[in-house]
Amino acid sequence: MALTSDLGKQIKLKEVEGTLLQPATVDNWSQIQSFEAKPDDLLICTYPKAGTTWIQEIVDMIEQNGDVEKCQRAIIQHRHPFIEWARPPQPSGVEKAKAMPSPRILKTHLSTQLLPPSFWENNCKFLYVARNAKDCMVSYYHFQRMNHMLPDPGTWEEYFETFINGKVVWGSWFDHVKGWWEMKDRHQILFLFYEDIKRDPKHEIRKVMQFMGKKVDETVLDKIVQETSFEKMKENPMTNRSTVSKSILDQSISSFMRKGTVGDWKNHFTVAQNERFDEIYRRKMEGTSINFCMEL
């Protein structure tokens, strides 16, 4: 599948089991699939634009007992290896993870069916964050506009069709969320909602701490809540991707950390799109007990 970016270059996405992925990821697929997870690994799992960087910073702050300086040791993308990441000649996510001492905190956007089997076999812990599909779509649209490693999204109307048909990198939102939701009672999965973290960060961060087997006092917990707020992270060069070259992420088009709100979809969806989306959602998510908050 070749899609032209606004740079005029062809970005040819490749497919694995019906899911579109970046070409370098697919070229590295056998290495990714044979990745050796360890029983004490914690894997942060999200669909793209569902609060990945946010939960990474929360987890790291907990791991470092609220020590802000320790969390400044490296940019966020270097702290938690992204297992399916590949961009030769840079070390791949798998190589970075292999070089990391245990216990490891890793990251993925892969669906349950594409995840390296060793994660299931080793009974690892999984931390999944889900965000409502409409806000995910809006955020992903703006991310594709500014990310030169991904195909140009076209107009909002065109992207709406692309997204609902699952023809985006990492595949269908519906399949991704449904897959992880259905696995949550069979494995060590803490399933969180972006909207809940937004509504009551302290309550949700406490859940993450308990899941990680960590204890911090109330003062430290309050500090973690404060330091992982959208406003703080947007200004933090270790989380806001400001160190990434403009040739890769052009933040003059759209900020990497754009709004971080619940309900921004209402500024993008037409009435007709909203009605159509709701109908597709009902059909695709039929039989699942999952419920999303669409506005706060």
From Swiss-Prot:
It holds the Pfam family Sulfotransfer_1. Sulfotransferase that utilizes 3'-phospho-5'-adenylyl sulfate (PAPS) to catalyze the sulfate conjugation of phenolic compounds. Does not transfer sulfate to steroids, dopamine, acetaminophen, or alpha-naphthol. Except in mitochondria, where it can add sulfate to cholesterol producing cholesterol sulfate, which alters mitochondrial membrane organization, and impacts protein complex mobility increasing state-III respiration, thereby modulating mitochondrial respiration. It comes from Homo sapiens. One of its GO terms (biological process) is sulfation. Belongs to the sulfotransferase 1 family. This is Sulfotransferase 1C2. The lineage of its organism: Eukaryota, Metazoa, Chordata, Craniata, Vertebrata. Keywords: Cytoplasm, Lysosome, Mitochondrion, Phosphoprotein, Transferase. Found in adult stomach, kidney and thyroid gland, and in fetal kidney and liver. The active site is at H109. It is found in: Cytoplasm; Lysosome; Mitochondrion. One of its GO terms (molecular function) is aryl sulfotransferase activity.
